[in-house]
Structures are given as structure tokens and as C-alpha cells.
């Protein structure tokens, strides 16, 4: 069974197209994208009882995708180069991936 890893990326929304192109170049076709708020230098500003309040969080996207081990370093390098902004990437090894519909396991399930 070929090794696969879970790639997590926290990126600004404007970087999504560049990240998708980097994924496609390495045949990383499936991903989950969620709108979240994360730490940033600007933060979210609101007015509460006449005072401006900044919570230190900015809108961003969290992307999760399963990536084959042999391309994960190249994908991380390309995403890092493409985003060129505030963001985070982290990679987690996966012990087992199963495609529920077919029962395929490991890299075949990706």
C-alpha cells in the first residue's frame, strides 16, 4: 500500500485559484474547502457600544486534501510559492484511507 498524507492549508481567500492549480499539477483532484477565520495581522473589526473592537481573526479558507507521499513535498513547495501571503500548511500521516462505496484501501482509495 502506497503511503498517503493529509495536507491541511489555511490560506487567504484570494489564493484559492493558485492553490487549486498547484494541486492539479500533481493530480491532487479532491479537496474539502471550508470558510473559517484564523489569526492575522489585520483582524476583524466591529463596533460595540461605540468602541471599535478587533478580535485578531481574519477570513480565510481551510483546505484539506489527501496527497500521495511521493508528491507531498512538491505540493507544499508549490502552494507556499503560490500563496505568498499569511497562511499555514501542515501535513499529517494517515494510517488508513478507505473508500466507503468500493471498500478500496490506501492509495487506491484516493
Predicted regions and their residues:
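Positively charged, small/polar-rich N-terminal and surface patches that mediate targeting and assembly
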Residues: 1-110
Amino acid at each position: 500500500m502506497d503511503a498517503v498524507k493529509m495536507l491541511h492549508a489555511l490560506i487567504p481567500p484570494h489564493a484559492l485559484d493558485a492553490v487549486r492549480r498547484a494541486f492539479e499539477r500533481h493530480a491532487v483532484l479532491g479537496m474539502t474547502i471550508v470558510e473559517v477565520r484564523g489569526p492575522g495581522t489585520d483582524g476583524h473589526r466591529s463596533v460595540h457600544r461605540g468602541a471599535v473592537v478587533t478580535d485578531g481573526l481574519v477570513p480565510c479558507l481551510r483546505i484539506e486534501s489527501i496527497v500521495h507521499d511521493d508528491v507531498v513535498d512538491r505540493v507544499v513547495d508549490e502552494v507556499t510559492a503560490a500563496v505568498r501571503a499569511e497562511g499555514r500548511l501542515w501535513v499529517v500521516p494517515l494510517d488508513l484511507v478507505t473508500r466507503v462505496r468500493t471498500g478500496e484501501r490506501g492509495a487506491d482509495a484516493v
